[in-house]
Every structure is written in C-alpha cells, then in structure tokens.
From Swiss-Prot:
Similarity field: Belongs to the helicase family. RAD3/XPD subfamily.
One Pfam family linked to the record: DEAD_2
Catalytic activity of the protein: ATP + H2O = ADP + phosphate + H(+)
Descriptive protein name: Regulator of telomere elongation helicase 1 homolog
Enzyme class of the recorded protein, top EC level: isomerase
Chain positions of motif DEAH box: 252-255
Length: 985
C-alpha cells in the first residue's frame, strides 16, 4: 500500500490520500503525539473511519518500534563498565532511556461507537488496511456472544446476564470453563480481525464462550472495539474490567455524545418497582421461614441471612413511605424538585454513602438466588432488585466533595404512575401483618397513595466526560460527520481540546444538488411547524412534491419526517386521497418500522426493490435507525427529502429543564448555548445525520431537498454542516418548484452521463446478509442463530454488508412453508395454482408504468409486460427512450388515481404481491398474507376470513382491479360466491 509521511509518521493508506484525509490524519497524529484531546468533524463519505484507523495505528506501530529500540539499548548496556568509568553524561542518558522504557509504555487504542453495526463497519474498514495484522478485539454483550442454549432462552438482557453469572459462579457452564485451556488456540489468537459474528463462529467451533474469550484477548490487543456505554457508564466499565490508563479513546459518531453522557448519569425508579421489591424480599423471607430454601437453591450456603433480608425490607418500606409523601402539584405534567430530594428520599430509608456498596452487593446476591428459584417455581427473577441496584450505583457515583456541582447539574422530576389493577387497598390490608406480610405501609394505614415515578436527570454531559478523563487516558478524540458548531460542544463537555477540525466534503460541487423548497407544485407553503402540520392543504402539497420528485429521481429516494406521528398522519392522508397509489406507481414505497425484526426484513425488501425495479421510496424518521446508521450509497439513495425540522417536543419536561439549565449556567466565559440555540441545534444535527445517508464516497452523487421554508432562516442555515452551507450560498432562499424540477432533471442527466457507474458488488451488497441471518441446526447447541452459509448470494455480499446488530434474532410473519416455497429452484416442478408465494425466486414479469411509448400491437389501453431476469437490475430499453420522457408538473390540481377500468392486476404472482404491497399498509399486507396461507390448506371458514380482509383492503374503487385479480388464486368452489360479493360492491 502507498506510504505517506504525515506529521512525521509513515502512514500506509489503501490509496493516495485526498487533502481532506491528509488534514484529518495530521490532526489525529498531533493529538496522539502530544497527549491532547481533539474534536474533529469530517463529512460522511470522506473516508473518516479509514483515516482515523490508519493514522492512529500507524502512530502506535511507530511507538512500538521505538519502544523495542529502547529495550535493546538497555539490554546491550555494559553496567559494570559504566559503573566504573562512565561519565556523568552517559549515566544520565542511560537513566533517561530506562525511564522511558519503563514508564513510557505503548498506549492502547479503544475505538467506541454507538452501535455494534457501526463497530462492524469500522472493523471491515480495518481489514482493508496494512494494519489488518495488528491485534484487535471487539467487546459485545452476552446477548450477542453467549452460545449457552439455556442462557439464550432467557428473555431480556438483564436475565441473560444474571443467568450467565449464576452458571459461571456455580461452574455449570462448560463453554466458559474451556476458555482458560483454549484461550491461546490459533483460531482465537490468529492474525485475522474478528467481529461479533466471527467470534461466535470460533466459539462454536472450539466449544468455548465467545463472551469470556474476547475478554481474554483485551490485554494483548493493540485496538479494542466497544460500544459507548462500556466506556461512559462506570458500572459497565467496572463489570467489563476496562482499564483506561495510558489509552487513546476514540469516540466515533460522537454527534450524540452529550445525550449519551447525560443518560449514563440519569436513572428512574417507580413506586411499583419499590412495591415489587418489597414483595420479592418478603417471598424470600417466607421461604427461609418455611425451611424450603435448601430445596430451592440446592446445597450451597446462602450469601445472605434472614437478618439481612429483614433490614433490607425495613429500608424499602421506609423508601416507599418517603416516595408516597412527595407532593406533586401538577398531576398532568409532574413537578420538578432540586437534586437534593433524591438524596433526602434515600437518606430517610438509610441508604447512605457508607452502606451503599454493601446494599448493592446484597441486591446482586438476591438476584442470583431468585434466578435459581425461578427454575422450580413461578416467581419473578429479581428485575426490581436490578433496578434498585442501578439507582444506588448511579446516584452515589457522585462523590460527596462535588455535591454543589451535582445540585447545579441534576434535577428530580416526579410524575404520576398509573396504578396497576390488583394493587389496591383491600389486597394490601389482607396481606399486611408482621414481617412476613406483603402489604405496604400505605395499605396498612388505610390510606390510598398514588404511585409515582421518580426521575433523577443529569443535564451536564461534562460529568460523564470528567469521569473518563479522571482515569488518566492519554487522549480523547471525538469525531463525526456532524459535530458543528464545535465551540458549544466543547464547552458543554468541559473537555480541554487542543486540536479541532471542520473538513469540507470530498466530492465536487457538481456531484451534489442542494435546494430549499419553500412551496409545493400548487404554491402551498411547505412548513412543518406546529401550526401547520395538521393543515390538509400542506399535507397534500407535500405529497404532490414527493410524487413529482419520484418521477425524476432514479433508483432510491429517501424521505425523512420529523417524527413517527407526522409520518403516520401523512401516510393516512395520502392513502385516502389516492396520492399514495400514484407515488407507488412510480416507485414502491417502504416505511421505517419501529420494531427491530420488521426493520431488518423491510430493509432487505427495499434493497431488493432497488435492484429489481425502477427504484423505491423509503420513508423514515429523523433520529431513527435509517437516519443514524445505514449506508445508502450509489443507487440505494440518489436523493433525500427532508420534510421538516425535527425539534424535540416543546412541552416535554426534560426539554424544558435542559433549556432552563443552559440559561442558568451560561456565561460569557464558558460559551454555552442558550436554551433556544440548543433547541434549534438538536433539530439541525438530526437533519445533518439524515442528509449524510446519501453521499457516501468520492464518486457518489445525489440531491438534497429541504422541504421546509424555515431552512432559509439564518439561524438554521448556520447550524447545517459546513459542506452543505457551501451549496446554499451566502443568502439561501426558497426556490420556486418549477425551476427546481428542470434543474433536478438536468442534474441527474449530467451525473449519469459523466459519473462512473458504481461497481455492482458495492451497490448490491448493503443488506443482503446484513440484516438477515437464519437458524442453523447445531448438534451441540440447538436454537443457536448464525449467518446463513448455503446461499451463494449471501456469501458474496457478506464482506461489504452492513451488519445490523442482533440480526440473528429476526422473526417475520412468514411461515416455514413460505421459505421452502420461495427457495424452489428454477426448472423444478411447477407450483400448484394455490401456491401463491412460490415464484419469488424465479424470473418474473414487471409492469413498466413509466413507459411512454405506444405498444405496436394490442389495444392502447393494455399495459405492456416486460420480461426481466431477477439477477440484474431493470434498465430502460434504450437511452433514447429515457430522454424522450415528458414529466407533467402537477399544479393546483388534485391528482386522482387512474380508474380501475384502465388497470389490470399483474399476471405473475410475484408482481401481484409487489403491486399489492405498494398499495396497502404493512399491517394490511401482513394480515392478507396470513389469511391467504391459512386459506391454502383451510376450510370454508378460512375463505370467509380471507374475503373479509380482501373486501376491507381492496374494495375502494381505485384498487378494486386488484380485488378482481385475486379471483384466479381462489379454489373453484369459492369463485361463484366471490363473483357475487364483488359484483354487489
């Protein structure tokens, strides 16, 4: 690989670095050399991660070489000769050399990011470099690395963690017990870089625990990859035994670092948590009193006594009493108190700095006990004890000598908690009675107290960073594509910064088209503020804007909304008006789901649609998974539409208190933002992140359309990324919609003519395996989930895929027979007429709705069907056809979908499914699929169920042609009734 001398350090880079990459690496090396901190911004797509890894590891390698030379010099020294006749200068030089060798040491690198998918991307970048042979390891959770079938059956990370601890403590986990004897195995210590998936595979092969094996690799690793919380959460740092002395801490994707620092120091406890903890302690006491404890927990002696339980219960009862006594003036919104209230509440229950370590230890022992007991009887597994332990750990992490700072930076906000049924006064009165009663003090006293939620919120991110700096780290580097403005970030984190950088983008001006669209095609103002977001005219105009843009933008179009409620509101309105169907005719639409399982399958379908058809539209939400971590390079994202500014909820108590904190602590010297400036910046940073999904590398190109007139305001423009501001000019203005359409069409025409076509491997890779893994049968470990190994397509895409964290737990609505049907090879036995899902892997037919040429045969009303191979993307028949297309600008006219008489349902099953998916919501499509599969092998009742769903989903005039098209998939005995019911519509 080419070698470049940067800041005096030879750096091997996969290619000759661009000026922005060279500037970035120079800043990194300066930080490491001087032992200082840096805040570095470089836009997404500039090779930030690659530059970061190469520069830091090049410096580490240089230091290792220097260290070895110093050690050799010491070994060769003739001490006897020096002692007898050496000069004072020689002795002094040798002394300095020995001092450097002993105390200087070679620092380690800790690379942290927000999610494991981002860490996997970074490790994949490292594999491309000359530093791929340096020792590395990634730390993950038990949820991701554990291969013990019993532990993996537990629900929730907390239960898995506690069950793992229990098995390790009782020496019943054979995987963990083998780690010591096999930790030096070549497969584990080899030169290859192992991510989470690789560690799991090695663990399965060697039959050792990947979780504990990875911890064994840390001391010898040159670079360790881990998520943020392992660093910033003191409890996680202690649990994972992370030593930070003389380390270089790199926080990538650090645009959310303030929030992460605040959240790591915040905690919540509910009245119901305390009440359940009292019940759990009481239950254990009853077991002790009855003599059943030995049967429940085996022959091992207990780590606690009945006296310990009695004391803990008394403390919990006092805590419950103290919480009940808190007066909430505003029941609807809650009441805010000084931070001292939390210490007062805990103090009344005798939780103090002096005994908190003992109490936390007792709570952890009780969790272990309940985990064992829960194997034999139906009881809770100690989750409330874990919550209480977290509360005490976080609240008392702040030392007594900094309490004045704590009181200025924290607030307690008390909200009302909805009481659960069955926790009433009568029940408590019956159960109260002596120490073995389960009732609470409130119940015993005959009063009915309202349950509360106690929030202990931190508003000073400097607390988390200060704890990090106090561990004697060598350097801290914060980096992201969207950190600006840097001064207020540095001020809030209270971190001394010697190096800072705001890089321009690596792409040419001609590769990016940026415009502010202030009005839609009907001249309706586009502004997604509180006063206008419910305006039907605005929602319609926004839909018309997306429709017109979808006609021009090739391949993938991303549309980001400020929030999920706004996204759902627009979808409902567009489906009712017919705009949804019209957009779907141009490109199939995908919505960002909120659940992890659905998200993974939806992304797969989106990438497949990009390859198989004329593109697709993905509608998502700022701050969601799509906007934060996924790569939409090349065809996957040719344009991004931002529909509004995603401001935090104005009335949210946490937002109100954050603004008050900034106003109260802002001075001329500390340069903190005002409350309003922070509020605006929080929205703009989310926009910057969403925009960064599109331009992903040097040869990429795309359009950025800001569809909210507020983007022209100077306060908003100044908070956009520097490279975007360069495209908007000194005085940004809203552009008329008509000229934008012409310019946008010309932009893509020029880009397609002048830019190099993307490599098909890069384009098709992103989520083919990413988000999907399958269950593979393992003889030793049933139900263990791994990446698929049989599908050649998945194998070829694996190297460049973006791994979505915990993708191995995906479950979709598709039954097992759907998967087997979809996997039928071409040329095999023909599927039956009822096997509706069977041809998704075969060559399919598609309807070219964009075709503007007349068919030479048949009626002009017919839709021309084009055959295509699934393995290649759909292309226009010729470039001349594309240039002859005419796009009609919709203005002041409500667009109605074509009548059902002019449409016919697709003939092929796969095309029918795709067309149906684009016309209905995800929930409707899932209901349809489930009913259809039940009908396939079902009875007359299943036909009635299917008909009910069909009539509910497809009875509207604009989609009735799809209802008619369903007839041929029905059994013969049901077709007459189908005709009667459809005919009566």
């Amino acid at each position: 690989m080419p070698e470049s001398l940067i800041a005096g350090i030879p750096v091997h880079f996969p290619f000759e670095p661009y000026p922005v990459q060279r500037a970035y690496m120079e800043k990194v090396i300066q930080c490491l050399r001087d032992g200082t901190n840096g805040v570095l911004e470089s836009p997404t797509g500039t090779g930030k991660t690659l530059s970061l890894l190469c520069s830091s590891l090049a410096w580490i390698r240089t230091r290792q070489s220097e260290h070895q030379q110093q050690m050799v010099k010491i070994e060769k020294a003739d001490f006897s000769g020096l002692a007898g006749g050496a000069t004072g200068g020689e002795l002094s030089d040798l002394g300095k050399t020995m001092g450097r060798a002993n105390n200087w040491g070679v620092p380690k690198v800790i690379y942290a990011s927000r999610t494991h998918s981002q860490l996997t991307q970074a490790m994949r970048e490292l594999k491309r470099t000359a530093y791929a042979n340096m020792r590395s390891v990634v730390l993950g959770s038990r949820d991701q690395l554990c291969i013990h079938p019993e532990v993996m059956r537990e629900q929730g990370n907390s239960n898995k963690t506690n069950m793992c601890k229990l098995r390790v403590h009782s020496k019943t986990c054979t995987f963990q017990m083998r780690v010591e004897s096999r930790k030096d195995h070549p497969d584990l210590r080899g030169p290859s870089i192992m991510d989470i998936e690789d560690l799991v595979k090695v663990g399965q092969r060697l039959k050792i625990c990947p979780y504990f094996a990875s911890r064994e690799l840390v001391p010898q690793a040159d670079i360790t990859f881990m998520p943020y919380n392992y660093l910033l959460d003191p409890k996680a740092r202690k649990a994972n035994k992370i030593e930070l002395g003389n380390t270089i801490v790199i926080l990538d994707e650090a645009h959310n670092i303030e929030k992460i620092c605040e959240e790591s120091a915040s905690v919540q406890i509910k009245s119901s948590d305390v009440a359940m903890a009292i019940e759990d302690v009481t239950h254990i006491m009853q077991v002790f009193a009855s003599g059943e404890s030995q049967d429940m927990a085996g022959d091992e002696p207990k780590d606690f006594t009945l006296d310990d339980l009695t004391l803990l219960k008394e403390m919990l009862l006092e805590l419950e009493k103290a919480i009940d006594a808190v007066v909430v003036d505003n029941a609807a919104e809650g009441t805010t108190f000084p931070a001292s209230l939390m210490y007062e509440l805990l103090g009344k229950a005798n939780f103090t700095y002096g005994n908190v370590a003992t109490i936390v230890s007792l709570l952890d022992k009780l969790v272990q006990y309940l985990l064992v007991a829960s194997q034999q009887m139906s009881i809770r597994k100690g989750g409330t004890f874990t919550m209480l332990s977290d509360l005490l750990t976080i609240v008392f992490a702040n030392k007594q000598d900094v309490m004045s700072k704590v009181y200025a930076s924290f607030k307690v906000h008390v909200q009302m908690e909805e009481s659960k049924q069955g926790h009433g006064k009568q029940q408590g009165a019956k159960q109260q009675g002596g120490w073995l009663g389960k009732g609470t003090i409130a119940a015993a006293s005959g009063t009915s107290k309202v349950a509360k939620i106690i929030n202990f919120w931190c508003f000073n991110p400097g607390f988390g960073m200060e704890q990090l700096l106090n561990t004697q780290v060598r350097s801290v580097i914060l980096t992201s594509g969207t950190l600006a403005p840097l001064k207020p970030l540095i001020a809030e984190l209270a971190i001394p910064v010697a190096q800072h950088l705001e890089n321009p983008h690596i792409v040419d001006q001609s590769q990016v088209y940026v415009k502010i669209i202030g009005t839609g095609p009907d001249r309706q103002q586009l502004i997604s503020n509180y006063a206008n977001r419910d305006n039907p005219k605005y929602i319609s105009s926004l839909g018309q804007t997306i429709l017109n843009v979808s006609r021009i933008v090739p391949d993938g179009l991303l549309v980001f909304f400020p929030s999920y409620p706004m996204l759902n509101k627009c979808v409902d309105a567009w489906q009712a008006s017919g705009l949804w169907a019209d957009i779907s005719c141009k490109k199939p639409i995908f919505l960002e789901p909120r659940s992890k399982d659905q998200f993974t399958s939806t992304m797969e379908e989106f990438y497949q649609a990009i390859r198989d058809s004329k593109g697709a539209v993905f509608m998502a939400v700022c701050r969601g998974k799509v906007s934060e971590g996924l790569d939409f390079a090349d065809r996957n994202g040719r344009a991004v539409i931002i529909t509004g500014l995603p401001f935090p909820p104005l009335k949210d108590p946490k937002v109100i208190l954050k603004r008050r904190y900034l106003e109260a602590n802002r001075t001329r010297e500390n340069q903190l933002l005002s409350g309003q400036e922070w509020y605006n910046l929080d929205a703009t940073r989310a926009v910057n992140q969403a925009i960064g999904r599109v331009i992903r590398h040097r040869n990429d190109y795309g359009a950025i359309l800001l569809c909210d007139s507020r983007f022209k305001d100077a306060s908003q423009v100044q908070q956009l990324s520097k490279w975007i501001r360069g495209h908007l000019g000194d005085r940004p203005q809203c552009s008329p919609f008509g000229p934008i359409v012409r310019e946008l069409r010309q932009f893509f025409k020029n880009a397609e003519a002048n830019m190099k076509l993307p490599d098909e491997r890069e384009t098709d890779a992103p989520l083919e395996t990413v988000c999907k893994t399958e269950d593979e049968p393992l003889a030793a470990i049933p139900k263990l989930k791994r990446e698929p190994g049989s599908n050649a397509t998945f194998k070829s895409a694996n190297e460049s895929a973006i791994k979505v964290e915990m993708a191995n737990s995906i479950k979709t609505w598709t039954p097992a027979d759907y998967a087997s049907a979809a996997g039928r090879k071409l040329g095999g036995a023909a599927p039956s007429a009822m096997d509706f899902m069977s041809r998704l892997d075969s060559n399919v037919s598609s309807i070219d709705f964009n075709c503007c040429t007349d068919s030479k045969s048949g009626s002009s009303d017919l839709v021309k069907i084009h055959k295509r191979e699934r393995s290649s993307p759909t292309l226009p028949e010729s470039s001349s056809q594309v240039s002859k297309k005419r796009y009609k600008l919709v203005e002041n006219i409500k667009v109605e979908p074509s009548s059902s008489q002019a449409k016919a349902a697709p003939e092929e099953r796969a095309d029918f499914l795709r067309a149906l998916r684009s016309l209905v919501t995800q929930d409707q499509f899932r209901r349809f699929g489930k009913a259809l599969l039940e009908y396939k092998n079902g009875t007359y009742e299943s036909f009635q169920d299917l008909m009910a769903i069909l009539l509910d989903v497809l009875s509207a005039p604009k989609v009735r042609y799809m209802l008619v098209g369903m007839r041929k998939y029905l059994k013969n005995e049901h077709k007459d009734e189908f005709d009667r019911r459809v005919g009566s519509l």
